Amino acid sequence: MNTFSLQTRLYSGQGSLAVLKRFTNKHIWIICDGFLAHSPLLDTLRNALPADNRISVFSEITPDPTIHTVVQGIAQMQALQPQVVIGFGGGSAMDAAKAIVWFSQQSGINIETCVAIPTTSGTGSEVTSACVISDPDKGIKYPLFNNALYPDMAILDPELVVSVPPQITANTGMDVLTHALEAWVSPRASDFTDALAEKAAKLVFQYLPTAVEKGDCVATRGKMHNASTLAGMAFSQAGLGLNHAIAHQLGGQFHLPHGLANALLLTTVIRFNAGVPRAAKRYARLAKACGFCPAEANDIAAINALIQQIELLKQRCVLPSLAVALKEGRSDFSARIPAMVQAALADVTLRTNPRPANAEAIRELLEELL
């Protein structure tokens, strides 16, 4: 039996920050990173809130938020006792906000509303029951899943993402595509998640290159913002897979941007998963739905067409190879493979991969990357 639950009220479109005017005479705690704390975007957020609110800011969030940061946030939340918490930023800020609120609730600290406002189009964290917390000492990322992690509200205002640099736009956009593809072939996929994942994938293929090349186009940014949320809805229900299980290790060990790590793995993982008939047919079906091959094409031809389009998309987005992305870390890559293999096997996202992957398979995939 499959279940499908959307617990976040979504507000989208240009000017949707205006919904924040509903909060009056509240203590509002904004969680963001240090860059956003000194960015005009924070002023935009402040100006969207009525003047009678008390506003506090926690700006200690770093890429791949750490256990230490979450503990620090819980302590500050206990001291401040806010009524509204706003996770403002990319996936790291939203993940940290969700984790801080969740763990605080378990300690008896409750709030009225948790709001997620993305300033990148990638993680879909604004509508998911997931967050990822890192342990830098061990070089491991821990994905957490719990229905209590759903934000109460999400605001998708494309005006907040027009200033995102091309490389970040590319990386986060490829994260969206990975979410959609992994949800699409998941054993827990359903008609409901298929609709979300297919639409998200189509939007990425159509709009990501323009978002990278002409980032000031609000309409294009809005399409990618929507794609991110659609894919987030899909994987929150259907799960992820091997791509994320390995990407978490590339990020934890080498601090690669998460979306880039996913992009570098994507076609390799597709070839691996296509080794089982169900996944092969699913990939082929998506390729045909996207118009990448004739309807009468066999599965192999359709999968090759999908892979070709992904590689072309990566080229349009000017994504580096793994060797280039690793920089000086390349010399340590082979030595770290055993640790990455074990951590990937323990990663919760592996549970919904369409093809079982043992240690040898993951090792071979990692070796193939270089």
UniProtKB/Swiss-Prot annotation:
Catalytic activity: 1-propanol + NAD(+) = propanal + NADH + H(+)
Main location: other
pH dependence as annotated: Optimum pH is 7.0 for propionaldehyde reduction and 9.0 for 1-propanol dehydrogenase.
InterPro entries with a match to the protein in the record: ADH_Fe/GldA, ADH_Fe_C, ADH_Fe_CS, Alcohol_dehydrogenase_Fe
Compartments (UniProt record): Bacterial microcompartment
Gene Ontology molecular-function annotations: alcohol dehydrogenase (NAD+) activity; iron ion binding
Regulation: induction: BMC production is induced by growth on 1,2-PD vitamin B12 medium.
Domain of life the protein comes from: Bacteria
Described function: An iron-dependent alcohol dehydrogenase required for optimal 1,2-propanediol (1,2-PD) degradation. NAD(+) and NADH are regenerated internally within the bacterial microcompartment (BMC) dedicated to 1,2-PD degradation by the PduP and PduQ enzymes, which reduce NAD(+) and oxidize NADH respectively, although there must also be cofactor transport across the BMC.
Assembly with partners or alone: Interacts with PduP, probably via the N-terminus of PduQ.
Anything else known: Bacterial microcompartments (BMC) 100-200 nm in cross section are formed during aerobic growth on minimal 1,2-PD-B12 or anaerobic growth on 1,2-PD-tetrathionate medium, but not during aerobic growth on glucose, anerobic growth on glucose or pyruvate-tetrathionate. BMCs can constitute up to 10% of total cell protein.
Record-given protein name: 1-propanol dehydrogenase PduQ
Gene giving rise to this polypeptide: pduQ
